């Protein structure tokens, strides 16, 4: 870890929504707050949440596949370190008995939470979810680097985001 260990997560046993991402970015590592960057700003818009709601651990759990910033590679941040999730993920998720909705961001989180669909493209997973919504929602990473994907898939904003906001509101209202 180029910047040293600084595990970042947010979790309360009463959380209704789990956000399963990749790993903290450089800005989040520096601030000590998950999604404290442009990706977090975009994600909060997607979910229809204010910053205070998003960072309320009694509502939202944020548990990335890698808890620490992994460093930067040729095309952005490196993937989460491979030893992290196998060591702690399952016991940590067991502490979230009230999770009603899991939002899965990025390829590594998708492989963990939707292992039977690891070979499917994100577009295929999202179209399947639109056809038959489940409590596990695959999402693109909200990074500004994914702008090209968003432009190639305008149906994401038109169809997925309204339903996503509805599901988020329902999960939080059940509290």
Where are these regions (language model features)?
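Generic C-terminal helix-cap and adjacent flexible tail
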Residues: 166-175
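A polyanion-binding, active-site-adjacent surface
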Residues: 1-167
